[in-house]
């Protein structure tokens, strides 16, 4: 009976972690609520100093360039947001959404005359720390992307072992269940850790250069909430798997010894 309740609650926590991680992974892939409100980080371009970031367009304004006020960055794509915080559109998912602030600014200029005055994306001027360590940031973004997918797959596999463990009472199933539950938890933890660390540092750089560039960043709360919920669910699932007995407890009763009558 103890194993029944242990596996039951482990399945609930595992399923909850799986659903939360999948929803977080799908954030900003479509312009539908609530998917479009789930993002890793939000770029605030509403106060961007055009004369500094785009020197060749120093006389232009943010509105004349057609730039969005905000850009929500997801794992697969990003969404553009206007000054009223209404989401205008979301880009099509195309694999890992690398962080490249220059490209995000350049690709969202909706003014052909302005684009003609710019040579290329290299015309966008940004803090040196962002440009010099771009490869490092994107390696962390790749880590975040790959580990969340690994976490989702391992959590699903763990659910399969949970179902099998209800039917077949053998030790290898318990061992494999605990094995996959641990690495699912570890993968999800690494994913949210790399996300928080990467974008927090970029936020720090932009904050210390805000007076020159007027660009800031905030961390996506919905994404953080979903992912930390998935991590907690995966951790509880692992703890429960560690308390699953390999085999049901069997109590052997010895038959009473028949006493022989004294002669």
Curated annotation (Swiss-Prot):
User: What would be one Pfam family of this protein?
Assistant: SUR7
Crosslink site: Glycyl lysine isopeptide (Lys-Gly) (interchain with G-Cter in ubiquitin):
260
Top-level taxon: Eukaryota
UniProt topological domain (Cytoplasmic) ranges? 1-6, 165-172, 245-263
A biological process term (GO) from this entry: fungal-type cell wall organization
Q: Which UniProt keywords apply?
A: Cell membrane, Glycoprotein, Isopeptide bond, Membrane, Transmembrane, Transmembrane helix, Ubl conjugation
Q: Which stretches face the Extracellular side?
A: 28-143, 194-223
Q: Which residues are glycosylated?
A: 100, 209
Topological category with respect to the lipid bilayer: Multi-pass membrane protein
Q: Which InterPro entries does the protein's record reference?
A: Claudin_CS (IPR017974), SUR7/Rim9-like_fungi (IPR009571), SUR7_domain (IPR052413)
Post-translational events: N-glycosylated.
State its location(s): Cell membrane
Chain segments annotated as transmembrane = 7-27, 144-164, 173-193, 224-244
Supply one GO CC term from the record.
Answer: cytoplasm
Induction field: By the HOG1 MAPK, cell wall perturbations, and nitrogen stress. Expression is controlled by the MSS11 pseudohyphal growth transcription factor.
What family classification does the UniProt entry report for this protein?
A: Belongs to the SUR7 family.
Q: What does this protein do?
A: Contributes to the wild-type cellular response to nitrogen stress through signaling pathways that regulate the expression of genes involved in amino acid biosynthesis. Required for wild-type filamentous growth, cell growth, and cell-cell adhesion.
Extra facts: Present with 1660 molecules/cell in log phase SD medium.
PANTHER family registered for this protein in UniProt: CELL MEMBRANE PROTEIN YLR413W-RELATED
Record's protein name: Protein PUN1
Q: Which organism is it from?
A: Saccharomyces cerevisiae (strain ATCC 204508 / S288c) (Baker's yeast)
Gene that this sequence comes from: PUN1
């Amino acid at each position: 009976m103890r194993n029944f309740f242990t596996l039951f609650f482990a399945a609930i926590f595992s399923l909850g972690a799986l659903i939360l991680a999948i929803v977080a992974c799908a954030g900003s892939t479509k312009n539908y609520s609530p998917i479009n409100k789930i993002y890793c980080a939000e770029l605030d371009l509403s106060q961007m100093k055009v004369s500094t970031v785009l020197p060749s367009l120093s006389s232009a304004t943010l509105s004349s360039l057609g730039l969005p006020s905000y850009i929500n960055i997801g794992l697969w794509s990003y969404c553009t947001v206007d000054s009223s915080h209404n989401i205008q559109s979301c880009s099509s998912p195309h694999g890992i959404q690398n962080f490249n602030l220059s490209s995000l600014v350049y690709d969202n200029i909706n003014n052909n005359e302005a684009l003609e005055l710019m040579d290329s994306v290299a015309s966008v001027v940004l803090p040196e720390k962002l440009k010099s360590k771009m490869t490092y940031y994107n390696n962390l973004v790749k880590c975040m992307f790959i580990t969340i997918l690994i976490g989702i797959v391992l959590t699903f596999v763990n659910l399969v072992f949970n179902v099998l463990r209800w039917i077949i009472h053998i030790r290898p199933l318990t061992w494999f269940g605990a094995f996959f539950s641990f690495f699912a938890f570890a993968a999800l933890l690494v994913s949210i850790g790399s996300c928080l660390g990467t974008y927090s540092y970029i936020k720090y750089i932009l904050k210390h250069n805000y007076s020159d560039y007027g660009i800031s960043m905030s961390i996506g709360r919905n994404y953080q909430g979903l992912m930390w919920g998935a991590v907690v669910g995966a951790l509880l699932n692992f703890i429960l798997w560690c308390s699953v007995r390999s085999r049901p407890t069997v109590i052997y009763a010895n038959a009473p010894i028949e006493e022989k009558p004294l002669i």
